[in-house]
Amino acid sequence: MASEHSFDISAALDKQELKNAFEQAKKELDSRYDLKGIKCEIDLSEKENIFKLSSSSEGKLDVLKDIVISKLIKRGINPNAIKELSRESGAMFRLNLKANDTIDSENAKKINKTIKDSKLKVNSSIRGEEIRVVAKQIDDLQAVMKLVKELDLELNISFKNLK
């Protein structure tokens, strides 16, 4: 039996789930009656995790955003991890949404501080874009998982490498 157990906290997105949400959103876009006759497009830049929405109507742009976010929720991606990058108007209204897939230093410090303030018998350390949590008992690690899930973070938190 291992003397110490550990896991990593990260904000990694499942690229396949992101792509599936994109495909489902495109399919719904094609079948929605309220969007018939209005030029609307949804594109996904997989490298940067950016959804590019465009519409000839500003009101329908918010409908497109709601469609994308609802599909992301159904695929298990936290909607708080989606940031609005830019909103442009002109002949076509455009909106860029970015799916955040990294833990920035501010959120990492917040998670680390919360874990240390919990008085659980665990050690946590920031390792780049991940946080390693080590404990002697798996129950303590599970308590940390629950604690981190309850935090109101704008990230898609995932737990990896439970040993």
From Swiss-Prot:
InterPro entries: DUF520 (IPR007551), UPF0234-like_C (IPR035571), UPF0234_N (IPR035570), YajQ-like_sf (IPR036183). GO terms for molecular function: nucleotide binding. GO terms for cellular component: cytosol. Pfam families: DUF520. The keyword Ribonucleoprotein does not apply. Keywords: Nucleotide-binding. Belongs to the YajQ family. Nucleotide-binding protein. This is Nucleotide-binding protein JJD26997_1583. It comes from Campylobacter jejuni subsp. doylei (strain ATCC BAA-1458 / RM4099 / 269.97).
